[in-house]
Amino acid sequence: MSNNTDLSPVHVIGGGLAGSEAAWQIAQAGVPVVLHEMRPVRGTDAHKTEQLAELVCSNSFRSDDAETNAVGVLHAEMRLAGSLIMACADAHQVPAGGALAVDREGFSQAVTARLEAHPLITIEREEITGLPPTEWGTTIIATGPLTAPSLAEAIAAETDADALAFFDAIAPIIHFDSINMDVCWFQSRYDKVGPGGTGKDYINCPMDKEQYEAFVAALIEGDKTDFKEWEGTPYFDGCLPIEVMAERGPETLRHGPMKPMGLTNAHNPTVKPYAVVQLRQDNALGTLYNMVGFQTKLKYGSQTGIFKMIPGLENAEFARLGGLHRNTYLNSPVLLDNVLRLKSRQTLRFAGQVTGCEGYVESSAIGLLAGRFTAAEKLSQAAVPPPPTTAFGALLGHITGGHIVTNDEPGKRSFQPMNVNFGLFPPVDVPKPEGKRLRGKEKTIAKKRALSARALADCRNWLSLY
């Protein structure tokens, strides 16, 4: 690390996981940083301490398996990149089987101590109530899901009021190769061709009356998660949880997101479905499909059991389950460029959960990328995005362009927060053992190993450019 004290500092707003990691990466590159954190001057309903990188929910960073789990691959890539968050997590690990879990107090204290001790990092405890003044120059905004209202309003004013969401409405996402296409079929309603569409842009899952009634009953009876007190109840038109719609009457769903009109079962064209669940392509690769209109507060265990009742989804593998939470985040695919800069004001860069990633590790990873991109620019170097074959690149791609933006559901935005998962990675050729054809679970594991090996090799090559 060489110090460039003659450089003007980079300002980072928000001392959570992403902001802490961004500040560390910038300082480690030799560029001075001012890290602004509003706690303890102003607290939140979720934070309990004034430590940086406080973990407000679980103490788990999820699987540490870097061979067959996408988040484990992201762990490995972050370690290769010199991540502060991963170093402190490893130093404060507690037993959790194959997962990386941490002593939450020890972890956040360690992050705080490392940042406070760094000669190029200045920590300012103050609330930033608006967008940074132009004289600050390059600034990273990493204010997280609980962004203070005044700053959120300023961001909304800069980006357009519709560009900032205050609650996520997450519908489950399914891996395409787990959908039974002997039951389901491709068709848009009334064969309508939308922008960039073919008239066959949805996968349709048909139900007869008996299946529909059993499904509605299961939705109503399923275990549900209550809102936390500070979240309020953010139901609004176009974003009702699927189980709340079911409770409004037995016919509500089949006249709403499950309406069968304009659809003909390609496998049985003479029999009209009583109801239809539609799945819409979620990423440009075509590896992921989301369940249209299926945002939910059902507990995860209930979701998997109930949604596998849907014909064609009996063996569905979920890349993400549904939810509805308090969460401030940008419509990033529209607003941010491929190195996380605001297109309309390129001195502003965003990082962490406010960009639309989901999870501790993912937020930290986007902070790491934002920090590296910013440091490169300050040092008059090129900010080179990671390859899409890496976990870094797959996650960045979802945020800045891999997600397909649609406008066909009034009251909803199609871009929703996402954890890293193998469905975000470009497909890979799976090596076949000589004279043997892989099937089932064996094939799935081989595919994951191939994706992981490619990701780590490509990540090492990318890091060698910096």
From Swiss-Prot:
Q: Does the keyword Transmembrane apply?
A: no
Organism phylogeny: Bacteria, Pseudomonadati, Pseudomonadota, Alphaproteobacteria, Hyphomicrobiales
The name this protein carries in UniProt is Methylenetetrahydrofolate--tRNA-(uracil-5-)-methyltransferase TrmFO
Q: Which UniProt keywords apply?
A: Cytoplasm, FAD, Flavoprotein, Methyltransferase, NAD, NADP, Transferase, tRNA processing
Q: Which HAMAP family match?
A: TrmFO
**Top class in the EC scheme:** transferase
Q: What EC number(s) does this enzyme carry?
A: 2.1.1.74
- Binding positions (FAD): 14-19
